[in-house]
Amino acid sequence: MITSFPVRNFLPRVTITSCAFFSKESTSAAGTVAEKKESELQKFAGKSNLLEKKKVGIFGTSTVPINTNFPNPKGVVDYDPDFSIKELVAELPNTRKTQGAKLSEEIKNAFNSVSIEKTELLEDIGFVRHNEARVDYRFDTQEKLDLWKIGCDSDWKEGFSTCSLVNSDRGTAVFSGNISTKVLKDGRVERAGWASMKLEDRKAFNRKKFLSKWRNFSHLLLKVRGDGRSYKIMLHSPLSMDFTWGDSFSHPLHTHGGPYWQYEKIPFSKFFHTVAGRIQDRQYRVNLEDTSSIGIVLMDRIDGDFRLEIDYIGVYNDTTHVEDFAYETYTLPVFNTHGF
């Protein structure tokens, strides 16, 4: 007989919320959407009860330590449910089945890729020609679209923005919704109005899949069609230590609007270091060996609907681009606020 006693979940979860795009009913249905989110959250938590919120650090990073039992796809802060051993044991067969199948497929792909005739293998070891491009992420199937998660301030109960990510008839992804800079009158939230989509492509048993295969290319390549707004591309590089969890490298994505596609080639040398979205004084080049995810964020402080259509994301190589890093950096004095 199994005795139930509480086990803390230190990695919170969140549900994925979608909304109608460019719908006049979206504003009037805000209360319904909020109730639906709360209902889904409670259903997802099972019989667990929400505990008292943990304190948040200076950059909004949770003080809750990592727990590998419960992955946190969206990095939601302060959601810390209480699960019993009985619930964990009941979930084990399903976890073993799904993750085991994923591991088997991973091993199979590893053996199939070991061939000198494979173009990807040659690219990974540095044999990349001038003007060569590789497309890594498309959105022509639901399975590929499911690798991407979305979020906005209303998911964190910090605003009223909404967003969705759906397939189009052309086999592309449409990231759309509504940005609202209206601030909640709770005495805590100071700014609002953002939405994002982020890659959550992981290996079996929730292991990170790094983008190290991009290290021999010079540019990030995107084919997009926007609405004239300025978005932001983010390369996320969280490491094992908690003070690196907010590390990312960013670059603006300016869209033209209108019916025409634009091919954006952004040099990796021009990505600047940010922590939780804040530009840092100490700048250094992005290390793609540590980059595990890519995201697109909209936070331009403009109320209204938005729409970004994405055909593919990949990398491009330009051998004439010899710039290592585009921004100034400096050597800190021996005695400084960061230590030796």
Curated annotation (Swiss-Prot):
Domain of life: Eukaryota
Claim: Mitochondrion is one of the keywords in the record: yes
Disruption phenotype: RNAi-mediated knockdown impairs mitochondrial complex I assembly. Reduced body size, reduced fat content, fewer embryos and an extended egg laying period. These phenotypes are exacerbated when nuaf-3 is simultaneously knocked down.
Keywords attached to this entry: Chaperone, Mitochondrion, Transit peptide
GO cellular component, one term: mitochondrion
GO molecular function annotation: unfolded protein binding
InterPro entries documented for this protein: Galactose-bd-like_sf, NADH-UbQ_OxRdtase-assoc_prot30, NDUFAF1
One record GO biological process: mitochondrial respiratory chain complex I assembly
Known function: Chaperone protein involved in the assembly of the mitochondrial NADH:ubiquinone oxidoreductase complex (complex I). Required for normal growth and reproduction.
Stated name of the protein: Probable complex I intermediate-associated protein 30, mitochondrial
Taxonomic source organism: Caenorhabditis elegans
Name of the gene this protein is made from: nuaf-1
